[in-house]
């Protein structure tokens, strides 16, 4: 497990935003033995040290809530750390890529030596955390990360085989694809009588994990769209394996993310090549490992690199080997982008799924407007798209944090059937005739962390050693200091808004919030045609009810069997 977890950090990562929704497990008191003939008492209320169970840390302590992770998953997730990244880079000489003689293709060398191609994807929330820590813009933080992972002054400088990441990509690219397809999914669900409404976002793995193990009745509501992390993993593995003629296990993909839950997402068996390649494959993960923003700094420290001194300018494009498909290369590494960086501030810091869906829907209804209604706290907001004549066309909402998610899930819970013959379902008597059991939303953006993804558990915190200079003397970071720090990270997240080049993609005229749906769909169609795979198998995923073994007496044999049987476990 990553060294970022220590006995000094036993609190839930979303504290003090919300209280833990699961009670602490109370262990039964030991029964006194009948063989004891003597009783010894002490004049103190303090228990003996031997009476206290040793404090232990598992992935359960880091994820969204207690009891949402099985022990088998905890083992799988604990293997992902900055140490694993360095171990992979030093395991064998990497595959060498060259332009062929004509300059129209990529040549691969070193396949027989057991090496791999290394690719990294970086989230904008992680860049924002780095930017706030070192006092730079989000874009400059991205350049520093790129120099660390693939530049001459980065980790390759002290590596055994001088391996580095061949490509460092921005997950904002696949985020745009997720926004377009997600918006179309919502619109399609409004006319499909067989679909469950509302559609709930599924890009937050903490929320998905909680739903699968605690509230399986909401699973039919989850969006089928993969997250930007997962979609990027599939895009990289499928394209490189097809274009370079190598197996997916020769491509090693690491993602830099803001929360620990993304490690769990990468371990899902639904996100392996077994899904898009078909049966009979080994189940190679689309994302091999996930490290957090904080672990990225630990990666630099492990190589003796002072992160703050890394260049804040881009690596020359002339030194980059182009991606082996021209159209996908221009998609992943656009020379000019028309948009607003990480999106409008009204979209929030979690990708803007809801914001884009509202504007996409409004763009198809001329004269309509978007109205905002604030909820009982800052993490609950209702939205409506209203026609020119005042008719409500769509209702949507944003629910962040588990305290608010609890209320949403409760409203979606189906009524219990009556035990009396001919009786109405329990709870239906309080509903007006014809009113559905759940809310009348068409779409709800759900995130586990209060404030959104910039407040993820893997982000650099105000009281971390690198930020101790911000605190005066021995003062500890309280709720107010943490709130101010999160505001700085949010500001860094949007710091790239004014720096985006003003140029369009193919000069399309169908832009919605800076994104061209036709360009996205054309690129995705090209991807499917290039790989020879059905687009639905590439961009969509599934969910299932999972029974957690946390707090249950599960033997080691059962745990080993569960891990060994997991498709994405690497066994």
UniProtKB/Swiss-Prot annotation:
What Gene Ontology cellular-component terms does the record carry? cytosolic [4Fe-4S] assembly targeting complex
Q: Name one GO molecular function term.
A: iron-sulfur cluster binding
BP GO terms, sorted: iron-sulfur cluster assembly
Task: List every stretch annotated Disordered.
Answer: 415-437
One Pfam family assigned to this protein is Fe_hyd_lg_C
Q: Which UniProt keywords apply?
A: 4Fe-4S, Iron, Iron-sulfur, Metal-binding
Annotated [4Fe-4S] cluster 1 binding lies at 20, 62, 65, 68
List positions binding [4Fe-4S] cluster 2: 204, 259, 449, 453
Question: Does the keyword NAD feature in the UniProt annotation?
Answer: no
Q: Tell me the domain of life.
A: Eukaryota
Q: Which family does it belong to?
A: Belongs to the NARF family.
Q: What function does the entry list?
A: Component of the cytosolic Fe/S protein assembly machinery. Required for maturation of extramitochondrial Fe/S proteins. May play a role in the transfer of pre-assembled Fe/S clusters to target apoproteins.
Please state what the protein is called. Cytosolic Fe-S cluster assembly factor NAR1
The organism's lineage?
A: Eukaryota, Fungi, Dikarya, Ascomycota, Pezizomycotina
